[in-house]
């Protein structure tokens, strides 16, 4: 209409979430049911993810661990129940707002173009473009590459890396994002012993710094050593939840995994060790 001045649409600047208090719930699922391919995958799951803690999702193949992680990330829709991030249903957040609040590491990472390692890590800074923290980009990228030990091949094409190297670059991207909620799906799966320990130490460090970390693990000894709490899944439900010392009971694990196991403390550290029972 002539004479009417229309408002200029200016993209909003990213606003970071306020610092979380220790123990604050940064993500939660209540009565969560998820169907994939017409079949139920999660059935009535309740879980909370708290600032300052590492929560490990464990359980046999097909138990629903990755699906639960995807639901907490707002990447997998709920058929019933609610998923909240920073106190609000995930549907209330826009994609850019979610990207400031949670960072996600999928099981596998692949790229169609020959991006260099540093370019891949820099992708983690995309949510902050145009915001007050954009000036942190260089430091965030450099720190993430150093912590994951990928700085030595920063210029190499991502597609030319080994599986373990790709996994560490993908983790560096997540760390560079500097979101207060980290959702990591099997981050140690392709790694050697040394780098498995490196990744879990980074998880603990992020939790000590006040972040909330959710990690899907198959190695129960790693979960016992590094997680504050574990959620043991079986057939789409949480069979038990709590500190590893409470959940990792020999009888329960043997039943859930349908495999006899032995649980005993490490003779020096006291950390729980879980090993399959083997006949002599």
UniProtKB/Swiss-Prot annotation:
Q: Which residues cross the membrane?
A: none
Q: Enumerate the InterPro entries for this protein.
A: AAA+_ATPase, ABC_transporter-like_ATP-bd, ABC_transporter-like_CS, P-loop_NTPase
Could you list this entry's UniProt keywords, alphabetically sorted. Answer: ATP-binding, Cell membrane, Membrane, Nucleotide-binding, Translocase, Transport
Annotated ABC transporter domain residues: 26-260
Molecular function (Gene Ontology), one example: ATP binding
Residues where ATP binds: 59-66
SUPFAM superfamilies from the xrefs?
P-loop containing nucleoside triphosphate hydrolases
Membrane topology according to the record:
Peripheral membrane protein
Task: Give the EC class as a word.
Answer: translocase
Catalytic activity, EC: 7.6.2.-
Asked if Ubl conjugation is a keyword of the record, the answer is no
Extract the CDD domains matched here: ABC_Iron-Siderophores_B12_Hemin
Q: Which residues form the signal peptide?
A: none
**PANTHER family per the UniProt record, alphabetical:** HEMIN IMPORT ATP-BINDING PROTEIN HMUV
Subunit structure, as described in the record: The complex is composed of two ATP-binding proteins (HmuV), two transmembrane proteins (HmuU) and a solute-binding protein (HmuT).
**Name the UniProt record assigns to this protein:** Hemin import ATP-binding protein HmuV
Q: Which gene encodes it?
A: hmuV
